[in-house]
Regions:
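Catalytic cores of alpha/beta
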Residues: 78-79, 84-101, 201-238
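Alpha-helix-loop-beta-strand connector modules within alpha/beta enzyme cores
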Residues: 58-81, 116-131, 195-222, 262-263
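Short, acidic/polar
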Residues: 29-41, 85-91, 165-175, 223-226
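Conserved anion-binding
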Residues: 13-15, 19, 98-186, 190-191
Length: 267
């Protein structure tokens, strides 16, 4: 029997409010994190992801009090990321109610952190978030893809998508799996906030190169987009924000639509 696919709302939090932008830019207010978290948990979300989107860029700690408040109103698995740089940071977040920690910039700066976290907290606790953007300045180090006009590679971006690393996302995904990541949260910056659908090419490429679960993120504008990414890739879960925050769709409706298309979710 195939494993059920997971539907995961995402709270991008900045200064204590949930926000949403397009391609990681031009963010606008989307509501209160605690209220939205409770709503999604009550509606039947499989998990919840909370990302403090400016913690790394501003070199500050994540908002632990907010994490604790959110954890107190939900009864589903809870992943928290943003500004986690050390074992102590991760421990604090887990003690404040998170079930998993997500690391992004810190894993690029210090890959051994992934291994250390896995050894202490277990693989099932560790999510490595990979933010990716197409880069058309390629060289021999990169796995290139032919575009209509020019070849490109999938580049890993850090600091909330604001800084390129020159790292090939395919090679990086394999590396974090080897280091002990339990799953990968894969966000396409090219698709983020556009509501034009998930980045099928990127998602498929990463899924085909790792064995750990991959969560697709960026671009969801309808339940049809979820159907498409589940049918065209081996992704285990989808992350969505805009369609839930602005009440375009409820989680019940999404799961019903997926069931009608033969996609099994956790009811």
């Amino acid at each position: 029997m195939p494993l059920s696919k997971r539907i995961i709302p995402c709270l991008d939090v900045d200064n204590g409010r949930v926000v949403k932008g397009i391609k990681f830019r031009g963010v606008k207010d989307a509501g209160d994190p605690v209220e939205l978290a409770k709503k999604y948990s009550d509606q039947g979300a499989d998990e919840l992801v909370f990302l403090d989107i400016t913690a790394s860029k501003q070199d500050r700690e994540i908002m632990k009090s907010m994490v604790k408040k959110v954890a107190s109103v939900i009864d589903i698995p809870f992943t928290v990321g943003g500004g986690i740089k050390t074992l102590a940071d991760a421990r604090e977040i887990l003690l404040n109610g998170a079930d998993k920690v997500s690391i992004n910039t810190a894993s690029v700066k210090n890959p051994e952190l992934v291994k250390e976290l896995m050894k202490i907290f277990g693989r099932q606790c560790i999510v490595v978030a990979i933010d990716v953007k197409r880069n058309y300045e390629t060289d021999d180090k990169h796995t290139t893809t032919s575009g209509p006009d020019k070849d490109y590679y999938f580049e890993v971006m850090i600091y909330g998508g604001s800084k390129g690393t020159g790292i090939d996302a395919i090679q990086w995904a394999k590396k974090v799996e080897e280091l002990g990541a339990g799953e990968i949260l894969l966000t396409s910056i090219d698709a983020d906030g556009t509501k034009n659908g998930y980045d099928i090419e990127l998602t498929n490429t990463i899924c085909n190169n790792v064995r750990i679960p991959v969560i697709a993120s960026g671009g969801c504008g309808s339940s049809e987009h979820m159907v498409e990414v589940f049918n065209k890739t081996d992704v285990d879960a989808v992350l969505a924000a805009s369609i839930f925050h602005y009440d375009k769709l409820t989680l019940e409706k999404v799961k019903k639509n997926l069931a009608q298309k033969g996609i099994q979710t956790r009811l």
